[in-house]
UniProtKB/Swiss-Prot annotation:
Its main location: secreted. Snaclec that binds to von Willebrand factor (VWF) and induces its interaction with GPIbalpha (GP1BA) (via the vWF A1 domain), resulting in platelet aggregation. GO terms for molecular function: toxin activity. Expressed by the venom gland. The keyword Plastid does not apply. One of its GO terms (cellular component) is extracellular region. It comes from Bitis arietans (African puff adder). This is Snaclec bitiscetin subunit beta. SMART domains: CLECT (SM00034). Residues 11-122 form the C-type lectin domain.
Amino acid sequence: DEGCLPDWSSYKGHCYKVFKVEKTWADAEKFCKELVNGGHLMSVNSREEGEFISKLALEKMRIVLVWIGLSHFWRICPLRWTDGARLDYRALSDEPICFVAESFHNKWIQWTCNRKKSFVCKYRV
């Protein structure tokens, strides 16, 4: 897609790639940061962006749960995206730790950070 690396998909000035390999949340974030300059686990800033990535994960890769860049490791700190984006759009479940995006219903689900899941990297074009 325009401005993105090969095999990446573009949406509103950002590039995305779903990785089927499973990693812990921290390892997935490290992978995204090392893969491309400005890369992070994806932030989701609107319902439409969430639907876009759900389609990529579910329809193209047959993946239901993917790590996203939202975490609440210390619980005394506010929730934050790994890329520094503001948390203007929320689709939270009850008890935040790390989060996966669930592709069928476009919802975020708390998940144990040390479990291994597929993930989505995102960077600005």
